[in-house]
Amino acid sequence: MYCQPKFFTLALLALVAGVNAHFQLQFPSPRGAFVEDNEPTFCDGYANPAANRTEFPLTGGFITLNSEHPLWTSGILLSTASDPTSFNNFSQITPYAQAHGEGLFCLPFDLSATNATGLQDGQNVTIQFVFNGGDGNLYQCADLTLSKNFTISSSITCSNASVSATATSTGAAATGSKSAALGTVPAFGVAGIVTALFGISLATVM
């Protein structure tokens, strides 16, 4: 079937944009400046912890990110090592979940609702956010100091680009290598991603 040049050009541009799409962790602050070419590697290419860690609450926290994919799967790994330098230093602490939507997303992240154990006030940890929009796993890390009394500043906005996102919860995935699989299971419905992945309802932060 004949394809008009204009339509073909637009279709090609859309395809290229999809292939090059990524995500950017907004809060907590990532380990270093976003480097698109390095995001498929450990901690977006940053092997060493940040000099200035982000204070983060043991309960009632959230994560904000910008998604450039219309359909994506995500999960969180955590390391309690003082200087985590490889995937082997991290353990999966949330199920993987799938969501629809591009733009800014606020994902409630209550550490007390994850399977992480032994976390304490004042402890230094690192989280690694795993994101897959269909073109392979992408990674960004954030180095944190945990606090039982800290409240995230109201200047850090917790809002979502879409409230019509659907989600699927997934079981545990392997975390020992960069090629950990991101599977799916039946859908939860509106705002299901934050309940399935991070342990509390989206309604508590909107």
From Swiss-Prot:
Q: Which InterPro entries match?
A: BIM1-like (IPR046936), BIM1-like_dom (IPR046530)
The record's cofactor note says: Binds 1 copper ion per subunit.
What domain of life? Eukaryota
Propeptide cleavage-removed residue intervals: 180-206
Sorted alphabetically, which keywords does the UniProt record give? Cell membrane, Cell wall, Copper, Disulfide bond, Glycoprotein, GPI-anchor, Lipoprotein, Membrane, Metal-binding, Secreted, Signal
Which Cys-Cys disulphide bridges does the record give? 43-141, 106-158
Q: Does the keyword Cell membrane apply?
A: yes
Signal peptide range equals 1-21
Cofactor(s) in the UniProt record? Cu(2+)
**Factors inducing expression:** Expression is up-regulated during Laccaria-Populus ectomycorrhizae formation.
Where does the record say this protein resides? Answer: Cell membrane; Secreted, Cell wall
Gene Ontology cellular component annotations, sorted alphabetically: extracellular region; plasma membrane; side of membrane
Q: Where does Cu(2+) bind?
A: 22, 69, 135
Lipidated sites in chain (GPI-anchor amidated serine): 179
The Gene Ontology terms for molecular function here are:
metal ion binding
Q: Does the keyword Plastid apply?
A: no
Instruction: Classify the protein's membrane topology as the record does.
Output: Lipid-anchor; GPI-anchor
**Glycan-bearing residues:** 52, 89, 115, 124, 149, 160
- What is the role of this chain? Lytic polysaccharide monooxygenase-like protein that has diverged to biological functions other than polysaccharide degradation since it does not perform oxidative cleavage of polysaccharides. Involved in fungal-cell-wall remodeling during Laccaria-Populus symbiosis. Acts as a cell surface-bound protein that functions in the copper-accumulation pathway. May also act as the major cell wall sensor that regulates MAP kinase-dependent hyphal anastomosis, the fusion of hyphal cells.
Tell me the protein family, please: Belongs to the X325 family.
Task: Name the PANTHER family on file.
Answer: COPPER ACQUISITION FACTOR BIM1-LIKE DOMAIN-CONTAINING PROTEIN, HYPHAL ANASTAMOSIS-7 PROTEIN
Q: Tell me the protein's name.
A: Lytic polysaccharide monooxygenase-like protein X325
Name the species this protein comes from. Laccaria bicolor (strain S238N-H82 / ATCC MYA-4686)
